[in-house]
Amino acid sequence: MFIGFDYGTANCSVAVMRDGKPHLLKMENDSTLLPSMLCAPTREAVSEWLYRHHDVPADDDETQALLRRAIRYNREEDIDVTAKSVQFGLSSLAQYIDDPEEVWFVKSPKSFLGASGLKPQQVALFEDLVCAMMLHIRQQAQAQLPEAITQAVIGRPINFQGLGGDEANTQAQGILERAAKRAGFRDVVFQYEPVAAGLDYEATLQEEKRVLVVDIGGGTTDCSLLLMGPQWRSRLDREASLLGHSGCRIGGNDLDIALAFKNLMPLLGMGGETEKGIALPILPWWNAVAINDVPAQSDFYSSANGRLLNDLVRDAREPEKVALLQKVWRQRLSYRLVRSAEECKIALSSVAETRASLPFISNELATLISQRGLESALSQPLTRILEQVQLALDNAQEKPDVIYLTGGSARSPLIKKALAEQLPGIPIAGGDDFGSVTAGLARWAEVVFR
């Protein structure tokens, strides 16, 4: 049996075809979405959990070496890896919030797959993280289906990483493919996420149109200009319908990070001075919220940075504020900070102003954020998104008849307004912002596996 599988940066979902239409399966708490989050007692617990409780093979030298190190470490630290040691989605978030110092938590592992400079052991670790999530998702889907799931079309962005090009894309897709096969999928095919989203929209068209698909996901923005219509449906070879592509590693997570940095970090002393009037360095505050940047997070949570924060508290004109950043370092609160910014971003799609409260840092710590403040904070990532739109159009040398806007950030009035200003007079259509890619992947699975 085949599925469409959106292994997303923000959320994961799965769809099957029923009576000619995509049907999304339940993933968690009666929702079709599973937030892309995972937690365990230690990162080493994930590798042992796969082997001990799910008989997932360690296929090559690096994964075997990782498994041996993991088992040895867990034994030395007296960590008993049980079947419930690894949690996913909102369940993992709840565990992390309950005890951030004792829980190893990762959000959006897909964000890291195309990173340059990854060592073989890091690639092996990310493969295990992805495999664990895919295994869990496959089990959730399998419980709702009568036949064994053996085939999947998995979505992928145009570019996994802003830098690195083909090498980064090859690395990231390789991790996804190996992880999927270890998780039990016999046949794996990849499809570009904006193309998949467009396929779902195409099912509604009665005539051929040039459709600009703008897919703003959690970790990437992908744009494709496509010829779509009844005559293209069910064609296995659609090369002639793909007029132009572009993609970059800017997505909803980057919007959340930018909002946290601009509006929340000043509460924690960013922009302050020493007693001598010297500006405090900005980098520790940026690294604290850059949750999709492995080197930045490693640097922030290093012991060297802990010593730097001690020095900053000692020298700052407002040491009580910098001490709050020190608490983020000590209790590993980066994800909670960015999550608070995300909640404000969502609220500002329907209200003019919202209150950001950070009681997990300090009871009275709060600030008001307006839509104008949001627009100012997001100006740089929004500019990058619009650059990708223009790049796809330049690549195609054609103008769209319609814009199909999708992805988790598609609901933002700021993005719709910016697109309307960039391409005046062109209608903007939308669908299921969180499910269109998955639905399109299921449609493509029916074409390639039928």
From Swiss-Prot:
<dbReference type="InterPro" id="IPR042054">
    <property type="entry name" value="YegD-like"/>
</dbReference>
<dbReference type="GO" id="GO:0051085">
    <property type="term" value="P:chaperone cofactor-dependent protein refolding"/>
</dbReference>
<dbReference type="InterPro" id="IPR013126">
    <property type="entry name" value="Hsp_70_fam"/>
</dbReference>
<dbReference type="InterPro" id="IPR018181">
    <property type="entry name" value="Heat_shock_70_CS"/>
</dbReference>
<dbReference type="GO" id="GO:0140662">
    <property type="term" value="F:ATP-dependent protein folding chaperone"/>
</dbReference>
<dbReference type="Pfam" id="PF00012">
    <property type="entry name" value="HSP70"/>
</dbReference>
<dbReference type="GO" id="GO:0005524">
    <property type="term" value="F:ATP binding"/>
</dbReference>
<dbReference type="InterPro" id="IPR043129">
    <property type="entry name" value="ATPase_NBD"/>
</dbReference>
<comment type="similarity">
    <text>Belongs to the heat shock protein 70 family.</text>
</comment>
<dbReference type="GO" id="GO:0016887">
    <property type="term" value="F:ATP hydrolysis activity"/>
</dbReference>
<dbReference type="GO" id="GO:0005829">
    <property type="term" value="C:cytosol"/>
</dbReference>
<dbReference type="GO" id="GO:0044183">
    <property type="term" value="F:protein folding chaperone"/>
</dbReference>
<dbReference type="GO" id="GO:0042026">
    <property type="term" value="P:protein refolding"/>
</dbReference>
<dbReference type="GO" id="GO:0031072">
    <property type="term" value="F:heat shock protein binding"/>
</dbReference>
<keyword id="KW-0547">Nucleotide-binding</keyword>
<protein>
    <recommendedName>
        <fullName>Uncharacterized chaperone protein YegD</fullName>
    </recommendedName>
</protein>
<keyword id="KW-0067">ATP-binding</keyword>
<keyword id="KW-0143">Chaperone</keyword>
